[in-house]
């Protein structure tokens, strides 16, 4: 099975690392590529820095692609060339167009840092803390058109302690 991984920040690394380990132990699984956001300027000096997913993927010998858009002919051609059976999406940072969601034979699976349907979209862990929630979690689901919609496959809860911060929740998920 050919899997295309799409992710950008540290949160996506846990899943990518697990997928790399699994693919190395199972010849029937191949990571055909990693799609991540383009390098962005950061800090006071606006130094161009790569996303954490790009750094790890390159260190792991995986092909990395950083398209500006998922809606042009160039990306459609890349998708056709990679021909993934499944796309795994973890905190990629852009909404996937229907053409991408519908492309792989087994669909797209998303890992989201909240107990959906609560906190769809960006910064779900931070929003749970701001709202004073006592628990949050992670949801794995098949993707559908729309923001964090689709059939849920798995949900796991995580208690938010009185002194927990973003880092505690991030690492706990």
Outline where the language-model segments fall.
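N-terminal Rossmann-like dinucleotide-binding module
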Residues: 1-44
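Solvent-exposed polar/charged
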Residues: 21, 58, 80-81, 102, ...
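N-terminal beta-loop-helix "entrance" segment that forms/cooperates
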Residues: 40-60
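Donor/substrate-binding cores of folate-linked one-carbon enzymes
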Residues: 86-173
């Amino acid at each position: 099975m050919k899997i295309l991984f799409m992710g950008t920040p540290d949160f996506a690394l846990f899943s990518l690392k697990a997928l790399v380990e699994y693919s190395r132990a199972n010849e029937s699984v191949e990571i055909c590529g990693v799609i991540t956001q383009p390098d962005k300027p950061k800090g006071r000096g606006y130094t161009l820095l790569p996303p954490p997913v790009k750094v790890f993927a390159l260190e792991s010998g995986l092909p990395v692609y950083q398209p500006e858009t998922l809606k042009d002919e160039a990306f459609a051609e890349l998708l056709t060339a990679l021909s993934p059976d499944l796309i795994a999406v973890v905190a990629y940072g852009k909404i996937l167009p229907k053409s991408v969601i519908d492309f792989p034979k087994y669909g797209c699976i998303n890992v989201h840092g909240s107990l959906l349907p609560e906190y769809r979209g960006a910064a779900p862990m931070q929003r749970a803390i701001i709202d004073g929630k006592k628990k949050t979690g992670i949801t794995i689901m098949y993707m559908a058109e729309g923001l964090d919609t689709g059939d849920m496959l798995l949900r796991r809860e995580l208690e938010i302690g009185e002194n927990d911060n973003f880092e505690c929740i991030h690492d706990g998920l």
